[in-house]
A protein has these predicted regions:
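Alpha-helix C-terminal capping segments
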Residues: 61-65, 83, 174-182
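Active-site-proximal beta-strand elements of phosphoester/diester hydrolases
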Residues: 44-48, 141, 186
């Protein structure tokens, strides 16, 4: 299997790179792409940078140049579901934008014109991950903001079922959708999307990234 991995931050890819063999790194249009192998799988990994544009650019570059069988977006997120706690892992079975509003033209809140409101993760891959660990799964929402109390309330008005919020997954999903490439999103909870989120995030972002990486490596182990 050839798997493409998009991580927003360096802290979120440490565990993944450490697990690879035959590692090489090259620049592609200003984006650093790391290639390696893990138990027979070809792994392509990039740190996209934070935000939707950065994530979309990195995803398009990866798919166009390397044609992975599966795109995985890993990293951290802020909890919207009150049952989640720091360190928990979430599988995004579907993702949506939390900051797109063209409702004046008859689209649903969060829907980009002429695109689906929800981008669906590959159901077969989701089922495979379900066998690995008892994690929460459901809707992940993305927007270009670090979510705290006020934004959290607004998001939950539009997406009351959302589990976590972050800044890249929907952009990764939209690009994968347009290329016809299967995808899945794995996010570790780094903060509770409240008034203390900024401080807590700095303390737990590495732990959250490590949780996502370990779950992904378990999936690759199961496919070896």
């Amino acid at each position: 299997m050839k798997i493409g991995i998009i991580t927003p931050m360096a802290e979120e890819k440490i565990t993944l790179i450490a697990a690879l063999e035959d590692v090489t790194t090259k620049q592609h249009g200003g984006t650093e792409i790391t290639s390696g192998r893990y138990k027979g799988h070809e792994v392509i990994l990039t740190e996209s940078g934070i935000g939707k544009v950065a994530a979309a650019s990195a995803t398009a570059l990866m798919i166009d140049n390397f044609e992975p069988d599966l795109v995985v977006n890993t990293g951290s997120a802020g909890a919207l579901d009150p049952d989640l706690k720091i360190g928990d892992e979430v599988i995004g079975t579907q993702v949506a934008y939390s900051d797109v509003d063209v409702t004046v033209f008859g689209y649903a809140y969060g829907q980009v014109p002429n695109k689906p409101l929800y981008y669906q993760a590959d159901p077969t891959v989701v089922k495979d991950f379900e066998q690995l660990a008892p994690v929460k799964e459901g809707l992940i929402v993305s927007g270009d903001q670090f979510v705290q109390d006020t934004a959290k309330k607004r998001i939950l008005i539009h997406f009351p079922e959302a589990l976590v919020a972050e800044m890249e997954a929907a952009a990764v999903a939209q690009v994968a959708y347009q290329f016809g490439t299967p995808f899945i999103v794995l996010r570790g909870v780094s903060d509770l999307a409240n008034g203390d989120s900024g401080v807590v995030f700095d303390d737990y972002v590495v732990e959250a990234g490590r949780a996502s990486a370990k779950l992904l490596l378990s999936y690759l182990d199961s496919k070896a």
